[in-house]
């Protein structure tokens, strides 16, 4: 375990030096900003080290790029995995924003597990999230997970806030899925969010895919009670590694 932690620390430093090559697109931030959960670490064969990533089109401009280095120890059903990553947008004009870098350490035992993720976006915020996952159903085609999460966040201006909650996540082997999330930000209110995703096309090797996604969220308490936010996106992605 100590070797995995040491590897994470070393690689975070390496990715930090590469961060300037992947500028991130600007975000609109009408409320407290919190990004979607980071992409879960992929599961690899025991003791295999893998460099991978993805490139996804962005209708707002540029492409969203991600680079990650993962190391797993164990079997596909029972393992510990460490990952370091950097993510941003390739667009540099008219405005570019810092690249988000981070590290994840996860444990999985037949679909049940724990995950710790630390992220840093210079000039924007720092976050530390803990997630517990329990697999409720999996028959090889349909999968249903229950998750509980807690995160501690600090914005660049020094403002700190927590975000805690639970979620149900359904996924289909063909790439379709839906997620229902209930979150609480103490002192600000509670939110209910429903997200859906559909795979419209994928290459034979499944490395290139066209996906449609949508989200709808509503504040159920606090000063923003009743306010809703809707979003949708269509993206072409290519995965490597």
UniProtKB/Swiss-Prot annotation:
Coiled coil: none annotated. Induction: By bacterial infection (at protein level). Detected within 24 hours of bacterial infection. It is found in: Secreted. Has antimicrobial activity in synergy with other peptides. Strongest activity observed against E.cloacae. Residues 22-23 form a propeptide. It comes from Drosophila melanogaster. Keywords: Antibiotic, Antimicrobial, Glycoprotein, Immunity, Innate immunity, Phosphoprotein, Pyrrolidone carboxylic acid, Secreted, Signal. Belongs to the attacin/sarcotoxin-2 family. This is Attacin-C. Not induced by bacterial challenge in imd mutant flies. Level of induction reduced by over 90% in 18w mutant flies. Toll loss-of-function mutation has no effect on induction by a mixture of E.coli and M.luteus; but strongly reduces induction by E.cloacae. The modification Phosphoserine is found at residue 127. GO terms for biological process: antibacterial humoral response; defense response; defense response to Gram-positive bacterium; humoral immune response; innate immune response; response to bacterium.
């Amino acid at each position: 375990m100590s070797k995995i932690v040491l590897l994470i620390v070393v690689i975070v430093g390496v990715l930090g030096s590469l961060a300037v090559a992947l500028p991130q697109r600007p975000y609109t931030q009408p409320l407290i900003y919190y990004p979607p959960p980071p992409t879960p670490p992929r599961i690899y064969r025991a003791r295999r080290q893998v460099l991978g990533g993805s490139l996804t089109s962005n209708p707002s401009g540029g492409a969203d790029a991600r680079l990650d280095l993962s190391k797993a120890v164990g079997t596909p059903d029972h393992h510990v995995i460490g990952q370091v990553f950097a993510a941003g947008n390739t667009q540099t004009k008219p405005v570019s924003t810092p690249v988000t870098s981070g590290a994840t350490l996860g444990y999985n035992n037949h679909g049940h597990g724990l995950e710790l993720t630390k992220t840093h976006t210079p000039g924007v915020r720092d976050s530390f999230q803990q997630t517990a996952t329990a697999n409720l159903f999996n028959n090889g085609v349909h999968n249903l997970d229950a998750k509980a999460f807690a995160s501690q966040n600090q914005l660049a201006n020094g403002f700190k806030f927590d975000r805690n909650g639970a979620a149900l996540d359904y996924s289909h082997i063909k790439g379709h899925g839906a997620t229902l999330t209930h979150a609480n930000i103490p002192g600000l209110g509670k939110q209910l969010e429903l997200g859906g995703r559909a795979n419209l096309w994928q290459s034979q090797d499944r490395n290139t895919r066209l996906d449609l996604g949508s989200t709808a969220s509503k504040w159920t308490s606090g000063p923003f009670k009743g306010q809703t936010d809707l979003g949708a996106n269509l993206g072409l992605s290519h995965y490597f590694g």
